[in-house]
Amino acid sequence: IGRPSLCELGARTLTTLPSGALRTSDAQGRPLSVFSGCGVMAEYATLDTRSLIKIAGDAPLRSAALVGCGVMTGFCAVTNTARVAPGAVVVVLGAGGVGLSAIQGAAVAGARMVVAVDIDDFKLGLAKTLGATHTVNSKGDDAIVKTLRKLTGGGADYAFECVGSGELAATACSVL
């Protein structure tokens, strides 16, 4: 817990060649070390055009910046990776930024039932406004899998763990 192994692996393999040489360089050919594959702490970055979206010039950058990570992670996990089908039953574990975006993705995909699960009633309220058809506060629910299986009529077609918890990942698998 607390060790993003895939991120650490990516940081080691996406920017550094096996020889230890760096993949990127500046205009003068000097090697550049980058973080997260594209220099996220840099003022400028070189990216593939497929990774870019145009935003309105008057869009607040504090809000627009969220779209590139949390929003796209949750939304695209549902629409691009899982390809949730219309009429599906979806369970989203965690109603933070990534989870709320997954809920929106499920609603846009046409899911028949979108169940948001969290321990915070405020977040669950937000989930309802963003497309959740049902909410479950799992705080103190030792039988959450049973609760979700009953609510979904036997299990979900898709389940998304949006917290980063091994225990919740197991729960996600168990509600399918």
Q: In which residue ranges do the predicted regions lie?
A:
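Short helix-loop-beta connector
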Residues: D58-L61, R83-V89, G154-G155
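Helix-to-beta-strand junctions that scaffold the AdoMet/dcAdoMet cofactor pocket
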Residues: L176
